[in-house]
């Protein structure tokens, strides 16, 4: 019986030692990702791109070596790119170059210098740095000009590889249903190209036929509705029922921030079209007590016509479009109302809403919005939220002819200023939403799911993350305490057994 107990103990100690040694080896050889959200695990989408590549992919990370003295992100990026290369099964050759040690300016390949203010970490200086990635495949080049975190790095790399390997073109049509809004969106095309690699093709709804350009664009953005008559509405309907993908940013109120007292309601055939589909645009502007604070008139003030959208007021939290989305600000928005029920072949998906402490302003009080934009009413009309965005998916029936779409995608928002230049300064995260909407319309869901994963990292000063500290501490405990202790016990047991045997 005693011999049997000794054998069991001996086997247990052997297996424990083997397991602990395996844990150490697996980190270096098998590249097992122990981070909470699998920060360094490459998705199936990217691996499929590797399989499609017929030639070697060259990825170079240019970064200033001095960065590592102040920030943690260069090492995070390097570790991620090493994991990226390992996952490619020799399809990717990765190298890093210290930008401080090369004489040729990186601007010539599209990687600009950045200035980082070090006063936040008690350094009285401003550091000029580079941190960008170059991808080369079959002599073609894609560049990620600025990289300071790994949260969206796989998405950016996969997009670049998709363009190089599959010759994918990302082109969005941009049409203004109100020509006066062009001035407020002068930078939109440039932002979309720089941030998401999306080409913008501007379309004149009055003169151009959408059926002629349907094959040239992946989706259509329409901003404003004031000048859309029934003839143009029919063009838009024809685009939709022929499976065109569309995003609409418009309000029922003609509001210009430069002329805040000249507020008038808008009548448009575009509203009639969407009402026939099942969504009504209400004649109001929504104000919300839970609005962001902005710098206006020399002071920081809570500006109630700007509605803060975050996890708390995202309605469809499981929808990939808004999964793991942070924040956006919806300015001067009308509310949207569902007037049809979900049907078997059509889904109506509410996206985001105001808070319960919100209120609406209608005629004849619209001109008072600017006067009362910083005042909260004593009581709210209703203790419920107002929907500010809807998605429609499925087979949509045209109100003008007997035709159904096969699989339409429409996103409607109640603000014509959501992606305006005002918001680029006031709420830059709005343009993260524009990129997500673009992917959604382009039916690049597989790429979109990369971006919908839990955030991998944030820009940090040169202090290791909690996960990294915990991992190092665990390895110290295993290697310096647990493993030696078990080996010592194993040796003592063997020694004791031999002495007794003798």
Swiss-Prot record:
Topology versus the membrane, per the UniProt entry?
Multi-pass membrane protein
The reply on keyword Membrane is: yes
Keyword Mitochondrion appears in the UniProt entry: no
Q: Which domain of life is it from?
A: Bacteria
Membrane-spanning ranges: 10-30, 473-493
InterPro entries attached to this UniProt entry: ABC_transp_unknown (IPR019196), DUF7088 (IPR055396)
List the subcellular locations: Cell membrane
Alphabetic keyword roster:
Cell membrane, Membrane, Transmembrane, Transmembrane helix
Q: Name one GO cellular component term.
A: plasma membrane
Protein name (record): Uncharacterized protein BB_0752
Say which species the protein is native to.
Borreliella burgdorferi (strain ATCC 35210 / DSM 4680 / CIP 102532 / B31) (Borrelia burgdorferi)
């Amino acid at each position: 019986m005693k011999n049997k107990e000794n054998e069991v103990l001996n086997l247990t100690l052997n297996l424990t030692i083997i397991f602990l040694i395996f844990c150490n080896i697996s980190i270096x050889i098998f590249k097992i990702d122990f981070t909470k959200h699998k920060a360094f695990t490459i998705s199936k989408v990217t691996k499929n791109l590797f399989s499609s590549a017929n030639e070697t992919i060259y990825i170079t990370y240019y970064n200033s070596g001095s960065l590592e003295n102040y920030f943690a992100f260069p090492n995070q990026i390097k570790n991620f790119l090493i994991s990226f290369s390992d996952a490619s099964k020799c399809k990717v050759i990765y190298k890093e170059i210290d930008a401080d040690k090369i004489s040729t300016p990186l601007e010539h390949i599209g990687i600009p210098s950045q200035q980082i203010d070090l006063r936040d970490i008690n350094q009285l200086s401003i550091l000029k740095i580079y941190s960008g990635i170059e991808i080369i495949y079959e002599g073609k080049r894609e560049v990620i000009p600025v990289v300071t975190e790994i949260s969206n790095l796989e998405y950016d790399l996969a997009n670049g590889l998709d363009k190089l390997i599959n010759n994918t073109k990302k082109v969005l049509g941009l049409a203004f249903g109100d020509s006066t809004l062009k001035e407020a969106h002068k930078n939109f095309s440039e932002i979309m190209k720089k941030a998401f690699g999306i080409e913008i093709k501007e379309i004149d709804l009055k003169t151009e036929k959408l059926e002629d350009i349907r094959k040239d664009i992946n989706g259509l953005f329409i901003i404003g509705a004031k000048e859309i008559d029934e003839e143009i509405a029919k063009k838009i309907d024809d685009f939709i029922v022929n499976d065109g993908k569309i995003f609409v940013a418009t309000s029922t109120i003609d509001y210009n921030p430069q002329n805040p007292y000249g507020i008038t309601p808008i009548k448009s055939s575009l509203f009639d079209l969407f009402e026939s589909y099942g969504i009504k645009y209400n004649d109001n502007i929504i104000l919300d007590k839970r609005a962001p604070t902005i710098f206006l008139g020399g002071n920081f003030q809570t500006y109630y016509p700007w509605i803060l959208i975050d996890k708390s007021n995202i309605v469809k939290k499981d929808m990939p479009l808004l999964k793991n989305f942070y924040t956006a600000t919806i300015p001067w928005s009308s509310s949207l109302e569902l007037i049809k029920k979900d049907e078997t072949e059509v889904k109506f998906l509410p996206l985001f809403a105001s808070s319960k402490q919100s209120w609406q302003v209608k005629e004849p009080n619209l001109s008072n919005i600017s006067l009362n934009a910083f005042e909260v009413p004593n009581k709210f009309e209703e203790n419920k939220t107002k929907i500010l965005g809807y998605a429609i998916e499925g087979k949509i029936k045209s109100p003008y002819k007997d035709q159904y779409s096969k699989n339409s995608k429409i996103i409607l928002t109640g603000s014509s200023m959501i992606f305006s230049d005002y918001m680029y300064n006031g709420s830059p995260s709005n343009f993260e939403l524009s990129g997500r909407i673009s992917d959604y319309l382009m039916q690049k869901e597989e790429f979109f799911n990369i971006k919908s994963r839990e955030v991998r990292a944030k820009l940090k000063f040169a202090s290791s993350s909690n996960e990294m500290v915990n991992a190092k501490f665990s390895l110290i405990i295993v290697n310096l305490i647990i493993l030696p202790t078990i080996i010592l016990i194993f040796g003592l047991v063997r020694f004791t057994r031999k002495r007794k045997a003798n």
